Amino acid sequence: MSRVCQVTGKRPMSGNNRSHALNATKRRFLPNLHSHRFWVESEKRFVTLRVSVKGMRVIDKKGIDAVLAELRTRGEKY
Protein backbone atom coordinates (compact mmCIF):
# COMPACT_ATOMS: atom_id res chain seq x y z
CA MET A 1 0.00 0.00 0.00
CA SER A 2 1.47 3.35 -0.98
CA ARG A 3 2.04 6.07 1.60
CA VAL A 4 -0.42 8.58 0.15
CA CYS A 5 -3.21 10.41 1.97
CA GLN A 6 -6.53 9.68 0.24
CA VAL A 7 -7.94 13.12 1.08
CA THR A 8 -5.07 15.58 0.62
CA GLY A 9 -2.80 13.56 -1.69
CA LYS A 10 0.21 14.10 0.58
CA ARG A 11 3.12 11.84 -0.39
CA PRO A 12 6.59 11.16 1.00
CA MET A 13 9.14 13.80 0.12
CA SER A 14 12.90 13.52 0.09
CA GLY A 15 15.47 15.61 1.87
CA ASN A 16 18.67 15.32 3.84
CA ASN A 17 19.71 14.34 7.33
CA ARG A 18 22.28 16.84 8.55
CA SER A 19 24.92 15.77 11.03
CA HIS A 20 26.67 18.15 13.43
CA ALA A 21 29.41 18.48 10.78
CA LEU A 22 26.69 19.32 8.21
CA ASN A 23 27.24 16.11 6.23
CA ALA A 24 24.18 15.35 4.12
CA THR A 25 22.66 11.88 3.76
CA LYS A 26 19.43 11.30 1.85
CA ARG A 27 16.25 10.51 3.80
CA ARG A 28 12.48 10.49 3.32
CA PHE A 29 9.96 12.63 5.15
CA LEU A 30 6.82 10.49 5.49
CA PRO A 31 3.29 11.88 5.88
CA ASN A 32 1.55 11.30 9.22
CA LEU A 33 -0.82 8.60 7.91
CA HIS A 34 -3.45 6.72 9.89
CA SER A 35 -6.01 4.15 8.86
CA HIS A 36 -9.21 5.60 10.31
CA ARG A 37 -12.86 4.51 10.26
CA PHE A 38 -15.40 7.26 9.65
CA TRP A 39 -19.14 6.86 10.19
CA VAL A 40 -21.11 7.97 7.13
CA GLU A 41 -24.60 8.82 8.38
CA SER A 42 -26.13 9.07 4.89
CA GLU A 43 -25.00 5.51 4.00
CA LYS A 44 -25.41 4.09 7.55
CA ARG A 45 -21.97 2.44 7.42
CA PHE A 46 -18.34 2.90 8.33
CA VAL A 47 -15.78 3.86 5.70
CA THR A 48 -12.08 3.18 6.27
CA LEU A 49 -9.70 5.76 4.81
CA ARG A 50 -5.93 6.06 4.97
CA VAL A 51 -5.57 9.73 5.82
CA SER A 52 -3.03 12.14 7.24
CA VAL A 53 -3.93 14.17 10.30
CA LYS A 54 -4.34 17.17 7.98
CA GLY A 55 -6.84 15.03 6.02
CA MET A 56 -8.77 14.35 9.24
CA ARG A 57 -8.94 18.10 9.87
CA VAL A 58 -10.26 18.61 6.32
CA ILE A 59 -12.95 15.98 6.99
CA ASP A 60 -13.87 17.75 10.25
CA LYS A 61 -14.17 21.03 8.36
CA LYS A 62 -15.98 19.95 5.17
CA GLY A 63 -17.79 16.85 6.41
CA ILE A 64 -17.32 13.24 5.39
CA ASP A 65 -20.05 13.34 2.71
CA ALA A 66 -18.38 16.21 0.82
CA VAL A 67 -14.96 14.54 1.02
CA LEU A 68 -16.34 11.21 -0.22
CA ALA A 69 -18.02 13.02 -3.12
CA GLU A 70 -14.60 14.44 -4.10
CA LEU A 71 -13.06 10.96 -3.89
CA ARG A 72 -15.79 9.59 -6.16
CA THR A 73 -15.16 12.28 -8.79
CA ARG A 74 -11.45 11.39 -8.72
CA GLY A 75 -12.39 7.73 -9.15
CA GLU A 76 -10.63 6.66 -5.97
CA LYS A 77 -11.67 3.53 -4.09
CA TYR A 78 -12.53 3.72 -0.39
From Swiss-Prot:
GO terms for molecular function: structural constituent of ribosome. One of its GO terms (cellular component) is cytosolic large ribosomal subunit. One of its GO terms (biological process) is translation. Keywords: Ribonucleoprotein, Ribosomal protein. Residues 1-21 are annotated as: Disordered. InterPro entries: Ribosomal_bL28 (IPR026569), Ribosomal_bL28/bL31-like_sf (IPR034704), Ribosomal_bL28_bact-type (IPR001383), Ribosomal_bL28_sf (IPR037147). PANTHER family: 39S RIBOSOMAL PROTEIN L28, MITOCHONDRIAL (PTHR13528), LARGE RIBOSOMAL SUBUNIT PROTEIN BL28M (PTHR13528:SF2). Belongs to the bacterial ribosomal protein bL28 family. This is Large ribosomal subunit protein bL28. The gene is rpmB.
